Amino acid sequence: LYIGSTDPLDPRHLQSLKTLIERTEPMLISEHLCWGAVNGKVLNDLLPLPYTEEALQHFCAKTTQVQEYLGRQILIENPSSYLQFAHSTIPEHEFLVAVAERAGCGILLDINNIYVSAINHNFDPSAYLAAIPVNIVQEIHLAGFENNGGCLIDTHSQPVCDEVWKLYHQALQRFGQVPTLIEWD
């Protein structure tokens, strides 16, 4: 869906998604906190948002629009990050929580993405976890990454590392038993 894109939501894609949801009745539906379409062209990548109040309002409005169309709550997943916008004014974890609170969506917390971003941007991944309210995390993802000269890349091509397992155990202590998926591509 690329909710963060400035393009309007594609009504055909939304209808196809709604039909699939009605047919399969999934327990949860998620979308990344990202953008990836410009002028009707899908870039097929999860591109980062500037974490500003303007981007937050935009993302919340489109998340609400998606939920209203689908007739159900969706989850928003934190991305892995390789760059940051200089004009961002809101830390990612605060932005993610604000989306959940304002749009009434849940959070899919990707522990590997937190770790990858923490190493790439030099922040404490445990503090990120501690800043997420307990009642809004509805799913957790784990995965492996590759180290590309000091920049960690979320590839899903490696086993889950010990540090991510440790963060996962912290997450379970904080959020309780949450459905968890190990991603492998």
Each language-model region and where it sits:
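Acidic/histidine-rich catalytic cores of soluble enzymes
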Residues: 67-151
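Glycine/small-residue-rich interface belts in oligomeric ring/scaffold proteins
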Residues: 1-12
